Amino acid sequence: MGKDYYQTLGLARGASDDEIKRAYRRQALRYHPDKNKEPGAEEKFKEIAEAYDVLSDPRKREIFDRYGEEGLKGGSPSGGSSGGANGTSFSYTFHGDPHAMFAEFFGGRNPFDTFFGQRNGEEGMDIDDTFSSFPMGMGGFTNMNFGRSRPSQEPTRKKQDPPVTHDLRVSLEEIYSGCTKKMKISHKRLNPDGKSIRNEDKILTIEVKRGWKEGTKITFPKEGDQTSNNIPADIVFVLKDKPHNIFKRDGSDVIYPARISLREALCGCTVNVPTLDGRTIPVVFKDVIRPGMRRKVPGEGLPLPKTPEKRGDLVIEFEVIFPERIPVSSRTILEQVLPI
């Protein structure tokens, strides 16, 4: 079952914008790592940020209300992405920094610094009560004076948010031939006034080269969320192999599990081995085949990443299926002919 963003924020469906803001403020303050040191607080803080990112955006919220998390992230019944080598994937992914969102919500300030910075945090204070009387939303603290001296006018050096990583799942056929993936992202961008923020969609194009190995990283610099006090994070896609219904991958080799009977293992057989490009290669075996034994078909695997004109091997891995029982007459014959 997918995430329920309303449940994450403790809201009922149909909550108003103000209720969503209040819920985010309450939950974010409760689980902020500067305040909450319990295990899992950091992950909960990220989930709260993602929930607010969706429910505070009318378009994302409408899709989520209709189709749930699966529909929002690309699997809605209204139309899935193409599965072909040049297929286009459209999906929402949260790639913002929850700490940057928190700071933006409170007008670029850290409320924990204001209230707790000179008092070592005072873990016992009730965060909800502390902030309940203050305005919410982006910039809610901007014009409030809490008795501290004004900071110097020297500009604060911006820091880049940490990289945001997403999996890029590809099939073995796509690795064999190479393909183009188009990923639609939604990120926040700073308007020309240098203060207000807009949501912006962008298509990131990834040229998957033949033979790329699992774990290959593709980086799009500074495509994360942008605010007035950060440098956007890099968006990093990490190549992951989709599970295949026939083959397994081992580097540039492709493993084909062949199931044969005990009679075939002892007496020899011909195995029709499929390939990634749709051909079938008949391979004859005359010797005894032991369970788990491997035989290679050279040059029928995946392209080598650095020299794609060369290819790895197709490896046949045998699984011998033993009979549940043997008739007495057959057992007698086997005892006579099989070596001890």
Swiss-Prot record:
Gene3D superfamilies: DnaJ domain, Urease metallochaperone UreE, N-terminal domain. This is DnaJ homolog subfamily B member 1. It comes from the Eukaryota. It comes from Mus musculus. Induction: By heat shock. PROSITE patterns: DNAJ_1, DNAJ_2. Residues 2-70 form the J domain. It holds the Pfam family DnaJ_C. GO terms for biological process: cellular response to heat; chaperone cofactor-dependent protein refolding; negative regulation of inclusion body assembly; negative regulation of transcription by RNA polymerase II; protein folding. Interacts with HSP70 and can stimulate its ATPase activity. Stimulates the association between HSC70 and HIP. Negatively regulates heat shock-induced HSF1 transcriptional activity during the attenuation and recovery phase period of the heat shock response. Stimulates ATP hydrolysis and the folding of unfolded proteins mediated by HSPA1A/B (in vitro).
